[in-house]
C-alpha cells in the first residue's frame, strides 16, 4: 500500500511509504530491525539508532547511488526525506534567477557533518559541486571516508576544516571563490544541559530508559552553541556581508518560527537586498529555511550566467 507523506517537495523521492522489501534487498542489515505496528503493518524500529542507520544506508544506496555510507557512533543520523527537501527547495530558489535550475551550481555546506548528507543528495539530484566546512576533525574524517568510498564524489565534493573558533564563513570562503548558495543546519540548543534534556525527551518519547545504550544526541558542535540557534545564525548574517559579491544566496534552516523576528532585524541591519522564507513540512514536522542576498535581480541573473 502506498500513502503520500504530506508536505514533501514535489521532486522529493520519498513521497510514498518505504518499500521495505526492496530496501532490505539493497541493505540486508535492515531486516533485523523490522517490526510490526499496532495496525499490523511492517515498519522499522525507529527507537533503535542502528535501525535508523541501516535504513539510511538503504535509502542512500537505492535512491542516491551512494553504495558506501557509514557514520561513527554518537553522531547524528539524519532523516533523509527532510534533508532532501532542503536541497529541492534550494534548487527552486536558485532557479528564480533565470527560470531554470543551474546544473553546475557551486554550494557551500556549513557544518557538513560526519554524514555528508546534503552534498550526497545535491550531487546526485542536480550535479552540483559542494564545499563542506566542519570544525570537528572526526566528522571531517568520516565525511571524507564516505566521499573516497564512492566513485565520482571526489570530483564533486571537497572538505575544509574550520580552524578559527567562532568563525563561519571567514577562513572557509577563499578570495576569488564564488558560490551560488550556502546552506546550514545550525546547532539548535544554547547549552550542553539543554542538549542533554532534548535527548532525554526524545528517549522518553520513544519509550526508552536510561539503561538503553543508545545515542540520540549527537556531538556538541552538532547540537549546541553559545546563544543557541539565533546567535549562530546572527553571526552568519554578520559575516555574510563580507562575502556579498562572492555568494548569491545565503541560507539556513530555522527550527522555530519564533526565532525569525530577531533574524529579520539582523538582516535589515546588514542591508540584505532580498530576504525569502521557504516553508517545508515532513509529515507532522514543520520546518523552514531563510535565505538572503545582497544582489538585486539583474545582478543575480548575471551571477548565474557567469559560468554558462
Swiss-Prot record:
GO terms for cellular component: cytoplasm. Specifically methylates the adenine in position 1618 of 23S rRNA. Belongs to the methyltransferase superfamily. METTL16/RlmF family. PANTHER family: RNA N6-ADENOSINE-METHYLTRANSFERASE METTL16, SAM-DEPENDENT METHYLTRANSFERASE. It comes from Escherichia coli O7:K1 (strain IAI39 / ExPEC). This is Ribosomal RNA large subunit methyltransferase F. Its main location: cytoplasm. It is found in: Cytoplasm. It is an enzyme of class 2 (transferase). The keyword Kinase does not apply. GO terms for biological process: rRNA base methylation. Keywords: Cytoplasm, Methyltransferase, rRNA processing, S-adenosyl-L-methionine, Transferase.
Amino acid at each position: 500500500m502506498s500513502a503520500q507523506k504530506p508536505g514533501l517537495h514535489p521532486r522529493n523521492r520519498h513521497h510514498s511509504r518505504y518499500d521495505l522489501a526492496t530496501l532490505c534487498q539493497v541493505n540486508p542489515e535492515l531486516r533485523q530491525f523490522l517490526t510490526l505496528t499496532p495496525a499490523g503493518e511492517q515498519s522499522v524500529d525507529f527507537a533503535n539508532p542502528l535501525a535508523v542507520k541501516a535504513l539510511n544506508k538503504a535509502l542512500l544506496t537505492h535512491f542516491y547511488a551512494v553504495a558506501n555510507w557509514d557514520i561513527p557512533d554518537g553522531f547524528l543520523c539524519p532523516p533523509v526525506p527532510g534533508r532532501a527537501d532542503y536541497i529541492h527547495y534550494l534548487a527552486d530558489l536558485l532557479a528564480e534567477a533565470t527560470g531554470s535550475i543551474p546544473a553546475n551550481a557551486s554550494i557551500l555546506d556549513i557544518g557538513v557533518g560526519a554524514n555528508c548528507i546534503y552534498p550526497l543528495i545535491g550531487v546526485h539530484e542536480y550535479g552540483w559541486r559542494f564545499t563542506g566546512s566542519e570544525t570537528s576533525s572526526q566528522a571531517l574524517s568520516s565525511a571524507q571516508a564516505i566521499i573516497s568510498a564512492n566513485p565520482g564524489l571526489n570530483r564533486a565534493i571537497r572538505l575544509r576544516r574550520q580552524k578559527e573558533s567562532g568563525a563561519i564563513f571567514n577562513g572557509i570562503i577563499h578570495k576569488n571563490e564564488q558560490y551560488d548558495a550556502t546552506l546550514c543546519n545550525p546547532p539548535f540548543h544554547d547549552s550542553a544541559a539543554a542538549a542533554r534534556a532534548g535527548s532525554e525527551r526524545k528517549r522518553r518519547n520513544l519509550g526508552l530508559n536510561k539503561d538503553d545504550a543508545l545515542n540520540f544526541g549527537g556531538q556538541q558542535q552538532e547540537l549546541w552553541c553559545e546563544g543557541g540557534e539565533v546567535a549562530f545564525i546572527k553571526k552568519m548574517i554578520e559575516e555574510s556581508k563580507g562575502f556579498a559579491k562572492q555568494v548569491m544566496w545565503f541560507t539556513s534552516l530555522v527550527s522555530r518560527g519564533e526565532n525569525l523576528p530577531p533574524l529579520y532585524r539582523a538582516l535589515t541591519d546588514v542591508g540584505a537586498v532580498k530576504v525569502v522564507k521557504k516553508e517545508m513540512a515532513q509529515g507532522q514536522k514543520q520546518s523552514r529555511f531563510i535565505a538572503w542576498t545582497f544582489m538585486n535581480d539583474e545582478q543575480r541573473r548575471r551571477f548565474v550566467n557567469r559560468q554558462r
